[in-house]
Amino acid sequence: MGTGKKEKSRIQRQGKVTGDPKVKGENFYRSAKKIKALNVLKEGKAIRNKEGKVVKAASYQSRDVPTAVIEPNRRWFNNTRVISQDTLTSFREAIAEKDKDPYSVLLKSNKLPMSLIRDGPKDALKKHQAKMTIESEPFSQTFGPKAQRKRPKLSFNTIGDLTEHSEKSMDTYQARLEEIKLLSGASGYGGGLADDDVQEEDFSVATAKEAIFTKGQSKRIWNELYKVIDSSDVILHVIDARDPLGTRCRHVEKYLATEAPHKHLIFVLNKIDLVPSKTAAAWIRVLQKDHPTCAMRSSIKNPFGRGSLIDLLRQFSILHKDRKQISVGLVGYPNVGKSSIINALRGKPVAKVAPIPGETKVWQYVTLMRRIYLIDCPGIVPPNQNDTPQDLLLRGVVRVENVDNPEQYIPAVLNKVKPHHMERTYELKGWKDHIHFLEMLARKGGRLLKGGEPDVDGVAKMVLNDFMRGKIPWFTPAPEKEEGETDTMEGREGRYGEMSKKRKRDEDDSAPATTPASAGEDAKEEDPENFAGFDSDSDSEVEEAAEEKGEEKSTAEDMIPLDASSDEEEDGEEEGSDVEDDEEGSDLDIEGASELEESESEAEAAPAPPPKKQRRSRK
Ligand SMILES: Nc1nc2c(ncn2[C@@H]2O[C@H](COP(=O)(O)OP(=O)(O)OP(=O)(O)O)[C@@H](O)[C@H]2O)c(=O)[nH]1
C-alpha cells in the first residue's frame, strides 16, 4: 500500500472503482484536528431549560479556565543556559583575563555574554538602582514644598531672563572669537582662510597658535583617518622610537577601544635605528603592556622587523579565514614613517616618502598579498591644549620652512640633545647661548647675509631639520624599569642617551658623521644583527638629496584614484619582493586617491568621527 497519491493511481491503473472511503489512502487517517472536533461532539451538548436558554454550557462552550499544573521546563526559554553563581564568577574572571590580554583575541565576542563580563555584577546593580530611584521617587519628594531633591542652580528665573542670558553669552563668545582670530593671524581673514572656514573653526584653545601648528588636525585629515579605521581590520599605530610618548595617539586607541573593539591594534615602533637598542627594547616593553608591539627600521634595502610584521599580518589573515581579504591601516603622527613601512613591506617604493611631514595627503590602498591590503593614512595630530608649538615642531609635525623665527626653538633642541653630540655633529665648541651657537655655525658654514651678517634664520632651520631627520642623535629614555625586568639603561648617564663607543671612535678617526646612517651606528654597535643602520644611500638621504636638488621624490608611478574602477591590477613581474612569492599569490596593485578636494588649512579642533554613511567607504 502506498501513499494516497500512489494508491489512487494504482486503483485507476487496475481499473477498480471503489466508493469505500475507508480504503487506506487519502483521508484514511484522521488528523489531530479532526479527532478534537469529534471528541467535542462526544462530550455532549449544552443543557437548556424549558425556554431553550443554555443552563449548562457544553464543554466546548465553557469559558472557565481549566485548572492545570504545568511542569516547568527550561526549554521554554529557548537558547538559555543555567549556571550556578560560582561557575558564573569563575567564567567571568577567566574571560575578563583573556579580554584584557593584548596577545589573545576573542573571536565571536558577540556570542559571549560580554555585558556580564564588562559591567560586572556591581556595576549592573548600581545601574539598576539608579534607574529604580528615578522610577520610584514619588512626586511629593521631587516637587512641591516637601521636595527633597536639590534644585538646579539657575541664574535666571523667567524665560525673559534666559533670553537675556543667552544673548549676553553669544556676544561674549563673538568677542572672544574675534580676539583669538586676531591673535592667531587669521585677522581680516588674510590668513588665507575663507569666511566660512573661520566660522567653522573651534577657537576654544587657550593660547592662540600659528596656523601651521594646526597641521594634521583638519577635519579633512580626521575624516581620512576615520575612513581608514572603518575600512581596516588591523590597525598599525606607527610610533617614532625617538619620542614614543609624544607620537602616541591615545585618541585613536580610545576610539578603537570604545567604538571598534573587534579591530586589532598593533604598535609599530619605527626608526629604531636612531635609538640605542636597549632603549628600543625598553620602550617595546612599556608599549607591549597595552598592545602587541613590533620594532621596525623601514628601509627598502636593509629593513629590520619586516619578517615578523609580515608574519603577524599573516596570522591575522588566518584568524579571519572567513574573509576574502583583510585590510591593514597604518595610522600615526605625520613623518613617523607610515609610507616607509609600506615600502619596506613591499620591498620597493610604492608609496610617496619624504623627510617632510604631510606628504601623504589622502588614504591609499596597496596590496601586500592577495589576502592582505595595506592602507596608508595621512599623518594625524590629536588636538591637545597642552601641546605647545615647540612640542609640535620637535615631534616633526610641522614643516620647518614655514616656521617664523625658527631660532626661538633652538634652546629646546639644545636642551634635548647632549652638548657633546652637538659639538661632534657640527664640530663646534664653546657657545654661550643659542644665538651665539647659530652665529658660530653660520660663520663656519659661510652662511652670511648681505653685510656679513650671519644667516641665523637659515641656520636655525637647518638645525631643526637635522634634529627631525635623525642627523643629530637624540632620544627619549624609557621609564624606569620595574621590579623583575632585566633590561636596563646602564652605562647611560643623564636624561638623554650617549653615543656608542664605535661612533665616538669613528668620529675621532674621521670627519663627523651627520647622516642617519651614523646615528644608526649606535644601535648597530649594540646589536649588530638587529640594527645594521641605514646604508649611506638610505631612503632619507636619497630623498633629502632629491629634495635639495628640487627633484621628484620616489612616488608610486601608478597612483589610481580610489574611485577609479580598476580595483585590482595584476602586477606579477616586480622584483625584489619576497612578499610577492607568498603562497597566496601575487596580484599586486596600488591604488591612491589623487584629488585633493579641500584645503588642508581648515583646522578643526574637534576630530569627532562623521556619521558612518558620510565617510567614503571602499566596501
Ligand atoms: N632613520 C630612519 N628613517 C626613517 C625610518 N622610517 C622612515 N624614515 C624617514 O622618515 C621620513 C618620513 O617618512 P614617511 O614614510 O614619509 O613618513 P609618513 O608617516 O608617511 O609621513 P606623512 O606623509 O607625513 O604621513 C622619511 O625621510 C624616511 O626616510 C626608519 O626606520 N629609520
Curated annotation (Swiss-Prot):
CDD domains: NGP_1 (cd01858)
Annotated CP-type G domain residues: 222-383
Classification via InterPro entries: G_CP_dom, GNL2_CP_dom, GTP-bd, GTP-bd_ortho_bundle_sf, NOG2_N_dom, P-loop_NTPase, TRAFAC_YlqF/YawG_RiboMat
Binding site for GTP: 332-339, 376-380
Biased amino acid composition, Acidic residues: 536-546, 565-603
UniProt-listed Gene3D superfamilies: 1.10.1580.10, P-loop containing nucleotide triphosphate hydrolases (3.40.50.300)
Record bears the keyword Plastid: no
Subcellular location, record wording: Nucleus, Nucleolus
An example Gene Ontology biological process: ribosome biogenesis
Keyword Nucleotide-binding included in the entry's annotation: yes
Annotated keywords: GTP-binding, Nucleotide-binding, Nucleus, Ribosome biogenesis
GO molecular function, one term: GTP binding
One GO location term (cellular component): nucleolus
Pfam families (UniProt xref): MMR_HSR1 (PF01926), NGP1NT (PF08153)
Function: GTPase that associates with pre-60S ribosomal subunits in the nucleolus and is required for their nuclear export and maturation.
Protein name as annotated: Nucleolar GTP-binding protein 2
Organism, as annotated: Neurospora crassa (strain ATCC 24698 / 74-OR23-1A / CBS 708.71 / DSM 1257 / FGSC 987)
